[in-house]
């Protein structure tokens, strides 16, 4: 369904090059700045319906007008009885102001039903090393229904309804 696809002759979709080092750590090179998605306006947003989902990441929060549009969308879908999934997917080189990044992350966490954090994002947001009690405390503080912290090859830790669940990573052969 491409009902809400908008074409813009002046802005292009970003191309991102991903490099993996020997330890499996990724680095990113963004080839188009600013990318078309950062020009999303509130007038581009649909009318949300009960039960619908919105998924977004912090890249949408890194610049205006997409920042205002993203927060407007998150609020609107919640009011309509829908749900918000948030994966910060932090790319620090897209943020010039760490204080603004933290403010935006806090606001997004308050509006999200499901949040997926990497271990690095967990440390940035919580200021702590990861343990089960702290994961559920963060979920409770922000009223997040399901909080997932991915641990690379070790799998994922999930806090859902105050209970912690551990799921092992799976080996994938390409």
What are these regions (language model features)?
Residues 33, 59, 89-93, 120, ...:
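Active-site beta-loop-alpha junctions enriched in small/polar residues
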Residues 75-76, 127-174:
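Conserved phosphate-binding/catalytic region of the ribokinase-like
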Residues 2, 84-85:
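Hydrophobic beta-strand scaffold residues
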Residues 67-74, 98-106, 129-136:
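Charged helix-capping and loop-helix junction motifs
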Residues 46-47, 107-108, 138-140:
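Structural alpha-helical scaffold elements that stabilize or flank donor/cofactor-binding regions
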Residues 54, 87, 115-118:
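Residue-level signal for inorganic ion chemistry
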Residues 99-124:
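Structural recognition of alpha->loop->beta junctions
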Residues 1-57:
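Conserved N-terminal subdomain of the carbohydrate kinase-like
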């Amino acid at each position: 369904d491409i009902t809400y696809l908008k074409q813009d002759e002046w802005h292009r979709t970003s191309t991102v090059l991903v490099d993996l080092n020997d330890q499996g750590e990724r680095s990113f090179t963004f080839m188009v700045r600013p990318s078309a998605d950062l020009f999303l306006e509130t007038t581009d947003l649909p009318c949300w319906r009960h039960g619908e989902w919105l998924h977004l990441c912090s890249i949408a929060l890194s610049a205006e007008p997409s920042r205002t549009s993203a927060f407007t969308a998150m609020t609107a879908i919640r009011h309509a009885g829908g749900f918000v999934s948030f994966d910060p997917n932090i790319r620090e080189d897209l943020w010039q102001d760490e204080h603004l990044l933290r403010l935006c992350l806090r606001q997004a966490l308050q509006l999200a039903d499901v949040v997926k954090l990497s271990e690095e994002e967990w440390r940035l947001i919580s200021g702590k090393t990861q343990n089960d009690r702290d994961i559920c405390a963060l979920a409770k503080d922000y009223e997040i229904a399901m909080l997932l912290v991915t641990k690379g090859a070790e799998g994922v830790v999930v806090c859902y309804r105050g209970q912690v669940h551990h799921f092992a990573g799976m080996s994938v052969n390409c």
